[in-house]
Amino acid sequence: MEKFEGYSEKQKSRQQYFVYPLLFQEYIYAFAHDYGLNGSEPVEIVSWNNKKFSSLLVKRLIIRMYQQNFLDNSVNHPNQDRLLDYKIFFYSEFYSQILSEGFAIVVEIPFSLRELSCPKEKEIPKFQNLRSIHSIFPFLEDKFLHLDYLSHIEIPYPIHLEILVQLLQYRIQDVPSLHLLRFFLNYYSNWNSFITSMKSILFFQKENKRLVKFLYNSYVSEYEFFLLFLRKQSSCLPLAYSGTFLERIHFSRKMEHFGIMYPGFSRKTLWFFMDPLIHYVRYQGKAILASKGSFFLKKKWKCYLINFWQYYFFFWTQPRRIHINQLANSCFDFMGYLSSVPKSPLLVRNQMLENSFLIDTRMKKFDTIVPATLLIGYLSKAQFCTGSGHPISKPIWTDLSDWDILDRFGRICRNLFHYYSGSSKKRTLYRLKYILRLSCARTLARKHKSTVRTFMQRLGSAFLEEFFTEEEQVFSLMFTKTTLFSFSGSHTERIWYLDIIGINDLVNPLN
């Protein structure tokens, strides 16, 4: 615990000061407006309350901020809500929205400077490829040979709003900025309630998207802070001894063999060298923690997490938020995939001089499968097929042109193949493709008052093939000259597209 407090104080020492004066600079609000227009993520509202950005309005805002001590009134007299008083032109919701976006830009600056000015800590180069913290795709491709249990964690949310301000206080000691943040939270939610209501949270998220993202990321970073600390503590010491080996898996095998050959070797000393192998990934407000050890050790981890949340965030956490499953028997939903960690046999032939050996190794790796029942249910709900998967026509689309009908069906099919290209078994995707193609043909035949057979004989099957081309075929044309890997007919190779993380409706690909 003393090491954790020392590590925490070291991080807190990198606090930044005086970000509040930046709110009086006009370019901050122009930058916030440009970010909303040119941001990497799509936004629904391109201007504040459907009003165009005006430098004149921003200048009026800054002048009135100089003239009136609105921050002092908002803190000392929170019931008056002077900043958002509609009777006064300055205290309007429009100016509050401008301040919210500008504040979100300003408060991110210290965190960006900390990343740029933070000195690089001493690292072992050979260990970089073994870390899987905060990275979804390396986590999915990792080998879990020495791991035994998976802990599914639901990150607690929402929490008391004052705790969000206190978490930022560890990183920023600018008191006026913290008071301004309290003011925004006080206006958009019920400050007297211990747990914020979901209705106020949804409204606050809609009106202050950038600020909400910043607050949530700050909260999650503090939540993950102790996990990163334990990761460094558990990995730093063994690295001095395992750094000479090519992979940690070989080091673990050699240490186990060393304990068998030398029974007098202290078990405590053996554990001193072994790495606990903590694998962690976060997604959609949830987290997965895979580690080595007994079930009793995992129960202690669960109690530790609950006590940590109660001590650090000052609220009671329900134990059902953490589920512990054995790695070999766990099957769960992960980003829209049906995931499990089965044991797959791997035969390796070892040739030593004139002797040949066959080594049977059991590998444990993430297996991602397309949820066929769930997706067919979505197609049935959207009236593409029946509940049993039998294709039907889409009557509501018969008023569209042939090109629009083909484009809509083809886009849905390509989106399915794009998102679920990371599946190790793609036969379900081909079944969904068959449903969509036949549903498209029946929709076109119904529009032209014909049968599917007559319609296909008149136009040919190639008429639909152009619009239902999987992206794997495109990759096969790109890599035919550079690699021996074949995409055509491959049902086990996985292709991960990085943009699927930014998809909001991960489970429902039809939106």
Curated annotation (Swiss-Prot):
It comes from the Eukaryota. It is found in: Plastid, Chloroplast. One of its GO terms (cellular component) is chloroplast. GO terms for biological process: mRNA processing; RNA splicing; tRNA processing. Pfam families: Intron_maturas2 (PF01348), MatK_N (PF01824). PANTHER family: MATURASE K. HAMAP family: MatK. Usually encoded in the trnK tRNA gene intron. Probably assists in splicing its own and other chloroplast group II introns. Belongs to the intron maturase 2 family. MatK subfamily. This is Maturase K. It comes from Hordeum vulgare (Barley).
